[in-house]
Amino acid sequence: MELFKHTLFINLDHRTDRLAHATAEFEKMGIVAERVKAVQPKNGAIGCTMSHIKCLELAKLREYEQVFICEDDITFLTPDLFTRNLAQFVGNEDLRWDVLIIGGNNVPPYQQLHEYCARVFSCQTTT
């Protein structure tokens, strides 16, 4: 199963350790990913947000219908569960979605739609 047609991951130039980590994680999952050079202003949180926007702009420019955007510290803890849940989500034509968040802290209230997904109105991440 091809998990994602297009995958972009954000990485700072000097974080070669994280580049190696992300590369190993993608290989483990069979994902072909493209590195995007992170934006690095003085404020790291702003740089992270700007880097995500950079990825979205790149995806729009390339006319990607869907894109998986992640950071270089991504870890797939349970690859089989992730693959199974993603396949169920993508295969469910009744689900309408614009953004799929695969990791974060969901803030109530949210709707548990299925065992493998919830409709979230607020999700906290580091940015």
Where are these regions (language model features)?
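An acidic/histidine-cluster motif and surrounding catalytic segment
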Residues: 1-70, 74-127
